[in-house]
Amino acid sequence: MLLLYNNFLKYTLLFLTGGFTYGGIEILFRGYSHVSMLVAGGICFILIGLLDEVFPWNMALISQMVFSAGIITAVEFLVGLVVNVWLKLNVWDYSAMPYNIMGQVCLLYTNIWFLLSLFGILADDYLRYYILKEKKPHYKIL
């Protein structure tokens, strides 16, 4: 029971950290955000952090960034389908951007997420190390 409680607290902390960071990034660049972005950010942060736990081999930092950009883009696409297409809330629309998919995601933002994911990976690793007392992170660049 204690392990279940500790995992709940851990993933709640990670979810809130990712959610508020994602929302904060949106507010910095767009001037506003939407609650769906807090949910998307929390999910993304947890999934990015699970890369270290799911893959048994020592994944290079660049590879983690590629996977993270894919994860963020996929989550943003799914949230966009629900929020923008199904619920018609029109929170964002990338249809004017080149290389977009249904106006929900585009190549430019996938590349931006690739770069920003470095900070997410490092934040997750050090949050887990310093606050949650998990293993010390180490990195292989390539």
What kind of feature is each model-predicted range?
Residues 1-142:
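Aromatic-rich, lipid-facing transmembrane alpha helices and their immediate juxtamembrane interface loops
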